[in-house]
Curated annotation (Swiss-Prot):
PANTHER family: CA-RESPONSIVE PROTEIN
UniProt subcellular location: Secreted
Free-text function comment from the UniProt entry: KAHRP might mimick human histidine-rich glycoproteins to anchor host thrombospondin or a parasite analog in a binding complex with the endothelial cell receptor.
Keyword Signal: yes
Lineage: Eukaryota, Sar, Alveolata, Apicomplexa, Aconoidasida
Gene Ontology cellular-component annotations: extracellular region
Biased composition (Low complexity): 99-108, 590-614
Stretch forming the signal peptide: 1-34
Gene: SD17
Native source species: Plasmodium falciparum (isolate NF7 / Ghana)
Residues the record marks as carrying a glycan: 42
Region (Disordered): 57-138, 282-301, 352-657
Positions with biased composition (Polar residues): 497-508, 628-643
Keyword Iron carried by entry: no
Biased composition annotated in UniProt, kind: Basic and acidic residues: 357-378, 399-408, 426-435, 473-496, 512-523, 551-578
Protein name, per record: Knob-associated histidine-rich protein
Length: 657
């Protein structure tokens, strides 16, 4: 920071004197010009004298100036002044031997001359006297009040008054574009298609035209300041009936759940990419529209959790919320930095925006593509977020996902199937996971990228893992241990941390790579799993079986996994999966995951291997994979699992009755 700061300071210092000079000169010129024009009318008297006195250099300079000004005459005088000041200064420095002294004189001289010249040039046919003021100076016509733009960007705000019409414009300093231009002739011409912000939104009697705004900015695409984040849904950005809106959604949710029943949930996972992103028309086509904005949180489905964690989520408004890890987003924010990253970061924004709100929207499109794509989107997001937020997003997304996913998956799947255990287990693990996730986040970034494939695996794994996790609450504690250990161990060691230390000294290092690779695989796996997740809860039962298989798969993973250690760990992962509880097992599993992840990477192609790897990864996911695989998985789990879980939860919760 310091070096940057200093650099900036230096740069600014260097630039500042010139800048100041320019301002001063321009001001002087402006004053002289004003006095000359106002007092002398034509300003010819001094101008000619000065002009006669001018040196050749000055004349040249003036010529340039004149030309320049003539060129810009159309601009407002104020604009002109700085411009000419700049020119003047430049020429003064360059052309005149005594720039400082001369500059002043020249400045005055020029000011008069300039004006005079200006008039003369502009209205050569008219005597100077006749042209009282250049049109640009006519305050009656147009007055521009400039507020210097701060160097470094931002907006230059200035007001223009046209007789009775007053506009506030915002001009982007970088590209000079105005959010509103001066073409409006009617004082009350508030919302023009081009310039919705011309009038204060709250100035209208009835408030801003939210519907029009929604049409114009359907998805809160104006959130330019939230680069890495999905923009908030309009619902969040505009004043007005959020609660009512949510109520609407809930009511719809109930109807939908009631009407669609479990089918809706099943239906949702298929749609989940869309539905999830939007809240999912999957839930109810009826609030597909609303869902786009709201569904994250508002949707009874898991969406809400991501979206509303703050709103509904904490209350557990949605199973999804749980899925999202309300604590990840909300509780976690407090207790779990990692989870917090997910939830809190978005929390502040309507948190869960990422998943819920805008994220949903994005996911929406991505998920539309498919869980995989959704994951891809999420991946992007994750990456984006990861890159942008780095840990945070990852944490949020990934970890949350990991957490949420592992939690959710665990929580969700387990939650659905073994909700209570899972939840407890998950919460603990999640908190832990969050920690480890943070550690892993960095890795996850790369992993995330790689994870896309792995995601699916991871999902499966997670599903399996979830089952396992749900199976063993103790494992959570262990897992926490594991996670912590992993965290302590560090990303690479994570694998190492417990059993990895034994098995994966070798694996640990590869494990880290593997994690990344595994992460990749996991992504794929996650995607694959996404499909699995669609049937997650059901899958969960299957997953449990799958988990057993996963254990078996772990053997497959042994084959699949490049590293025996990984395989051992994978085997261990069996234990871990079985254990899911013993931190050793879990850790081994996690370690295995690294190895397994290798396998997963290797097996990325093979779902079975991937699953196995994924399972191993899954343990890993709890720790590392939560970051990597979970990242991917999370997406699916979140979207689909959330949907499923949310639907189930709804059923359980009574959204559906």
């Amino acid at each position: 920071m310091k070096s940057f700061k200093n650099k900036n300071t230096l740069r600014r210092k260097k630039a500042f004197p010139v800048f100041t000079k320019i301002l001063l000169v321009s001001f002087l010129v402006w004053v002289l010009k004003c006095s000359n024009n106002c007092n002398n009318g034509n300003g010819s008297g001094d101008s000619f004298d000065f002009r006669n006195k001018r040196t050749l250099a000055q004349k040249q300079h003036e010529h340039h100036h004149h030309h320049h000004h003539h060129h810009h005459h159309q601009h407002q005088a104020p604009h002109q002044a700085p411009h000419q000041a700049h020119h003047h200064h430049h020429h003064g420095e360059v052309n005149h031997q005594a720039p400082q002294v001369h500059q002043q004189v020249h400045g005055q001289d020029q000011a008069h001359h300039h004006h005079h010249h200006h008039h003369h040039h502009l209205h050569p046919q008219q005597p100077q006297g006749t042209v009282a003021n250049p049109p640009s100076n006519e305050p009656v016509v147009k007055t521009q009040v400039f507020r210097e733009a701060r160097p470094g960007g931002g907006f230059k705000a200035y007001e223009e008054k046209y007789e009775s019409k007053h506009y506030k414009l915002k001009e982007n300093v970088v590209d000079g574009k105005k959010d509103c231009d001066e073409k409006y002739e009617a004082a009350n011409y508030a919302f023009s298609e081009e310039c919705p912000y011309t009038v204060n939104d709250y100035s209208q009697e009835n408030g801003p035209n939210i519907f029009a705004l929604r049409k114009r900015f359907p998805l809160g695409m104006n959130d330019e300041d939230e680069e890495g984040k999905e923009a908030l849904a309009i619902k969040d950005k505009l004043p007005g009936g959020l609660d009512e809106y949510q109520n609407q959604l809930y009511g719809i949710c109930n109807e939908t759940c009631t009407t669609c029943g479990p089918a809706a949930i099943d239906y949702v996972p298929a749609d989940a990419p869309n539905g999830y992103a939007y809240g999912g028309s999957a839930h109810d086509g009826s609030h597909g529209n609303l869902r786009g904005h709201d569904n994250k949180g508002s949707e009874g489905y898991g969406y809400e959790a991501p979206y509303n964690p703050g709103f509904n989520g904490a209350p557990g408004s949605n199973g999804m919320q749980n899925y999202v890890h309300p604590w990840s987003g909300y509780s976690a924010p407090y207790g779990v930095p990692h989870g917090a990253a997910h939830g809190s970061r978005y929390s502040s924004f309507s948190s869960v925006n990422k998943y819920g709100k805008h994220g949903d929207e994005k996911h929406h499109s991505s998920k539309k593509h498919e869980g995989n794509d959704g994951e891809g989107e999420k991946k992007k997001k994750s990456k984006k977020h990861k890159d942008h937020d780095g840990e945070k997003k990852k944490s949020k997304k990934h970890k949350d996902n990991e957490d949420a996913e592992s939690v959710k998956s665990k929580k969700h799947k387990s939650h659905d199937c073994e909700k209570k255990k899972s939840k407890k287990h998950k919460d603990n693990e999640d908190a832990e996971s969050v920690k480890s996730k943070k550690v892993l986040k960095k890795r996850e970034k790369s992993i995330m990228e790689k994870n896309h494939a792995a995601k699916k695996l991871t999902k499966k794994i997670k599903i399996k893992k979830k089952t396992n996790n749900s199976k063993s609450d103790g494992s959570k504690a262990h897992e926490k241990k594991e996670n912590e250990t992993k965290n302590t161990a560090g990303e690479n060691k994570k694998v190492d941390s417990t059993s990895a230390d034994n098995k994966s000294t070798n694996a640990a290092t590869p494990g880290a790579k593997d994690k990344t690779q595994g992460g990749k695989t996991d992504k794929t796996g996650a995607s694959t799993n996404a499909a699995t997740n669609k049937g997650q809860c059901a899958a969960e039962g299957a997953t449990k079986g799958a988990t057993k298989e996963a254990s078996t798969s772990k053997e497959a993973t042994k084959e699949a996994s490049t590293s025996k250690e990984a395989t051992k760990e994978a085997s261990t992962s069996k234990e871990a999966t079985k254990e899911a509880s013993t931190s050793k097992g879990a850790t081994k599993e996690a370690s295995t995951t690294e190895g397994a992840t290798k396998g997963a990477s290797t097996t990325a192609g093979s779902t079975t291997g991937a699953t196995t790897g994924a399972n191993a990864v899954q343990s890993k996911d709890e720790t590392a994979d939560k970051n990597a695989a979970n990242n991917g998985e999370q997406v699916m789990s979140r979207g689909q699992a959330q949907l499923q879980e949310a639907g189930k939860k709804k059923k359980k919760r009574g959204c559906c009755g």
